[in-house]
Amino acid sequence: MNKCSQFVIYVLCLFSVLLSQHVMANEKTYRCEVLTDAYIKSNGELSIVQDSPRVGQEFAVVKRTGEVIGDVMDSLKNPKVLASGSKSNPYKVIWVQRSAGKNGAFVDYLSIEESASGGKKPFGFFSGGLLMTGVCEQ
């Protein structure tokens, strides 16, 4: 192998390392913890679930894709990121799944308040009559 070939291989290796670091840096993830678990009662009032097994559970959200990793919401498929978040607009992702009934659908929604001061950003997760709240960090 001549010096020119070695140099080309070196440059290609260096480029691939730098590119992979750039990709990983852009793959930001939220780490979230559930602090409150509630549901909407039949009379429209909000009821906090006492001793909920969800409280204290953690999950992660891949910011670019909306994919959720963790037991709290692991069954959610095909997320759609509606807003990637900024100082003036929360990060928003939805999941839409067809229900068994005609023209029915299940819609789940996650909002993370990126504009909140400090490192912990409040979130709200809504699924039908279920509401979970907590905090996320990047």
Language model: regions and residue ranges:
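Short, solvent-exposed loop/hinge segments that bridge or flank secondary-structure elements
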Residues: 33-68, 104-108
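Short, solvent-exposed mixed-charge patches
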Residues: 137-138
